[in-house]
Amino acid sequence: PTFVDMDAPDHLRQRGMVESFFERSHVDGMMQYIVKTAQDLMDALKAKGKNGEPVDLIEHFALPLPSYIIYTILGVPFSDLPFLTQQNAIRTNGSATARDASAASQGLLDYMATLFDKRLAAPQDDVISKLAIEQVKPGHLDKAEAVQIAFLLLVAGNATVV
């Protein structure tokens, strides 16, 4: 279970492991990046519609913007955005079979576990590295628990920001 499903004090302990990345000071420090990302997406949107053809604002702006932000916080490479977006859509769109939705969830968990191993080997300034180095390496969490937290932030970060 992740901290969403826990009561205090376990909820507070697990939430505390990642909350510094979501505090105002950290978000304020990302503001220039967020504004630039929004501007880049808007510029790309304008370029797509320069000949008067319609452009899907949701697909080309509203969905990618929060994804880029949460992926930056987590440490997810942007090159993986299409795969992650597709898997998340399958698991949440309501028209997939239960088997397909479950497979998509497992695909995301497997992806996060692989990324977690990479961050253990080469940490960066991101949530996954922080969990790996500060929680799993010293034995406060096992890898599966840390992967679940990262998975929760990945899927909830996309869903709640949009």
What do the predicted segments below correspond to?
Residues P1-I58, S67-T85, A89-S95, R99-A103:
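Active-site substrate-recognition loop segments, prototypically the cytochrome P450 B′-helix/B-C loop
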Residues V4, E23, V27, D117, ...:
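Alpha-solenoid HEAT/Armadillo repeat architecture
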Residues L41, L84-G139, A144:
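Cytochrome P450 catalytic core segment centered on helix I
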Residues H60-L63, S67, Y71-T72, Q135-V162:
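Central I-helix of cytochrome P450 enzymes
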